[in-house]
């Protein structure tokens, strides 16, 4: 998305921060770095990733690699990919189709194939028919894919081409919901008629209120949209101006998970009953919030590129109200700082 005059579709790969000063309710440092007393500071994680487990609404974190013993017993799983930017061919990554293919190969190699994929936007870089065609050919028909658009998918025609391809059964500019194994998923669109930051708009908020009506508060809810629904860095437009209206509707639910893309870096926050998570890109990294004059594609050494690109695997154990999120880089190596493009 863009902040006033700048497009902020980029992603920061986030400077590695391994020292968390968050505290437990009694004021002591908790082993998972979570301040359970209130609003969490934004936490950036490296490509080795972090596993979030939600047991009874209480978040517990594990470093990627410390897989849950119950993983084989999960009810179902899905994978989030984001910001493939098909058509981009500049210095930050001259072959985005190759890195997307690497991500898809990584998904195929998972020990337990996911039930479906979620793509959180910026499928293409320029909304060109050939770019959409390439993406469709690469994702193929092996499993179901749920999409939401990024601003790069709507920049030419306000998303008409995107809706013609991926909007069947959706409402408005492409929002919709569905249910899987007792979990309610909601795809939101916050990239149309941008006003400095992401925006949902009143028609979509009215639809969301109706969609949530009748759901029991015990039903796990997963929202996914392109631009972060939380204020990651408003100076760069990395947030959604009217998201608080949506969150007010979600307070009654025991477990709410929000998945976003757009900033091309893994960042997490827990606030009350809501867990926020942004994903890496499969195309290119971007600078950490505030670390450069503006967001944009960031060039890193060629042998480090796949360290800062990746996928997100999500598993659910519904009866235990448990959710686990695992971020994996394409190489499996630690994310390293890079230089601005």
Model-derived regions: residue spans:
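C-terminal/domain-terminus segments
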Residues: 325-341
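Active-site neighborhood of phospho(di)ester-bond hydrolases with catalytic His/Asp-centered motifs
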Residues: 81-82, 117-121, 146-151, 224-225, ...
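N-terminal secretory signal peptides and thylakoid transit peptides that target proteins
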Residues: 22-54
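Short acidic, glycine-rich surface-loop motifs adjacent to enzyme active sites
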Residues: 217-232
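Surface-exposed cleft-lining segments at the edges of enzyme active sites
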Residues: 90, 191-199, 230-235
């Amino acid at each position: 998305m863009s902040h006033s005059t700048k497009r902020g579709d980029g992603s920061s790969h986030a400077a590695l921060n391994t020292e968390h000063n968050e505290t437990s309710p009694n004021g002591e440092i908790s082993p998972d770095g979570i301040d359970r007393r209130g609003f969490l500071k934004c936490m950036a994680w490296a490509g080795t990733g972090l596993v979030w487990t939600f047991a009874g609404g209480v978040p517990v974190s594990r470093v990627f690699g410390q897989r849950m013993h119950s993983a084989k017993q999960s009810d179902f799983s899905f994978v989030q990919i984001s910001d493939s930017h098909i058509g981009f061919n500049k210095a930050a990554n001259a072959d985005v189709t190759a890195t997307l293919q690497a991500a898809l190969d990584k998904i195929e190699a998972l020990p337990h194939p996911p039930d479906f994929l979620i793509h959180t936007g910026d499928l293409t870089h320029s909304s060109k028919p050939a770019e959409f065609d390439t993406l469709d050919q690469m994702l193929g028909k092996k499993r179901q894919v749920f999409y939401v658009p990024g601003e790069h998918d709507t920049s030419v025609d306000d998303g008409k081409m995107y809706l013609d391809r991926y909007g069947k059964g959706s409402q408005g500019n492409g929002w919709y919901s569905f249910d899987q194994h007792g979990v309610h998923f909601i795809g939101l669109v916050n990239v149309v008629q941008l006003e400095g930051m992401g925006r949902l708009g009143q028609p979509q908020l009215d639809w969301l209120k109706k969609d949530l009506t009748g759901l029991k508060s015990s039903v796990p809810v997963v929202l996914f949209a392109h631009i972060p629904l939380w204020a990651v860095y408003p100076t760069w437009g990395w947030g959604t101006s009217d998201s608080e209206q949506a969150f007010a509707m979600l307070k009654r639910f025991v477990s709410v998970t929000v998945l976003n893309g757009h900033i091309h870096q893994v960042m997490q926050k827990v606030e009350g009953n809501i867990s926020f998570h942004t994903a890496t890109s499969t195309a290119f990294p971007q600078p950490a919030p505030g670390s450069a004059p503006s967001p944009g594609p960031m060039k890193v050494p060629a042998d480090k590129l796949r360290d800062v690109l990746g996928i997100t695997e999500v598993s659910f154990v519904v009866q235990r109200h448990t959710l686990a999120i695992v971020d994996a880089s394409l190489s499996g190596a630690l994310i390293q700082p890079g230089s601005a493009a």
